[in-house]
């Protein structure tokens, strides 16, 4: 059983990138559906305000810390995690393991045409990977999309609708897709399609992808301002715990 670490009300699997990918492969050999969630600080805060969303995340089979802020908060709370596991890197590690195994991947989300472009790029990057279908994120009814995924006989679905929409969609429709593993991956399809560039490696290693994105998109300042509040919440919980023990 994988060790879990509670951070501000949400339990994370304390895993490395490789451990997370191996765990996902193991889940694919069990009857599904299994939800993989990739919360960052913004998503944790959202889960604290929305009990229903919080329950869906808590029920996920694999919860990985996508966001350096989650790792910092864990240290503040005295419950250190093994490290950050970016969702985009988790997806890459999972696809590398799927390639050649005959496991089938469906891509759901983004603007029309983006998922198809991502599929073409991934087929080149991961020889042997079977992308069995795509669907954009602009749809009104869930059932036809779930049926499309079922007909494609997908083993894994990357659901890229943004949080909390993607996790709630998986909770409602996961069983109807017939897939074993469904992963909430936010804006990953835009990256796989080459529409959005990841931060340079130096920024990634330093955990400063958020700063790079802020420089590229100043309009994100409102969202980024939530990170200090998240860390303050962690510090407040640590102080409160200290008072209870004193």
Can you name each region flagged by the protein language model?
Residues 3, 71-74, 98, 198-246:
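A transmembrane-helix-recognition feature enriched in membrane-embedded lipid enzymes
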Residues 136-140, 180-216:
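Short, flexible loop segments at boundaries between secondary-structure elements
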Residues 149, 153-163, 179:
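Proline-aspartate-enriched helix->loop->beta-strand connector
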Residues 40-43, 161-166, 188-189:
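Short glycine-rich anion-binding loops that position phosphate/pyrophosphate groups of nucleotides
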Residues 61, 132, 155, 180:
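Conserved acidic residues
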Residues 51, 55-59, 167-187:
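A short, gly/pro- and small-residue-rich
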Residues 71-148, 152:
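Conserved beta-alpha
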Residues 1-83, 88:
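N-terminal nucleotide/polyanion-binding subdomain common to many enzyme families
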């Amino acid at each position: 059983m994988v060790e879990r670490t509670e951070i501000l009300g949400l339990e994370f699997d304390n895993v490395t990138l490789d451990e997370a990918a191996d765990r996902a492969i193991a889940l694919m050999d069990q009857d599904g559906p299994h939800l993989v969630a990739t919360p960052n600080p913004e998503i944790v805060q959202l889960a604290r305000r929305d009990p229903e969303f919080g329950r869906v995340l808590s029920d996920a089979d694999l919860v990985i810390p996508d966001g350096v802020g989650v790792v910092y908060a864990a240290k503040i709370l005295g419950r250190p995690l093994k490290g950050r596991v970016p969702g985009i890197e988790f997806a890459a590690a999972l696809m590398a393991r799927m390639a050649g195994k005959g496991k089938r991947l469906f891509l759901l989300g983004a603007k029309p045409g983006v998922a198809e472009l991502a599929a073409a790029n991934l087929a080149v990057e991961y020889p042997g990977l079977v992308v069995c279908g795509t669907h954009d994120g602009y749809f009104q009814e869930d059932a036809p999309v779930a049926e499309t995924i079922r007909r494609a006989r997908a083993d894994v679905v990357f659901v890229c609708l943004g949080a909390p929409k993607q996790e709630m969609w998986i909770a409602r429709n996961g069983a109807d897709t017939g897939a074993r593993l469904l992963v909430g991956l936010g804006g990953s399809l835009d990256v796989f399609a080459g529409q959005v560039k990841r931060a340079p490696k130096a920024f990634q290693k330093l955990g400063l992808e958020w700063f790079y994105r802020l420089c590229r998109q100043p309009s994100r300042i409102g969202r980024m301002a939530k990170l200090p509040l998240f860390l303050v919440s962690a510090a407040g919980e640590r102080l409160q715990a200290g008072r209870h023990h004193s």
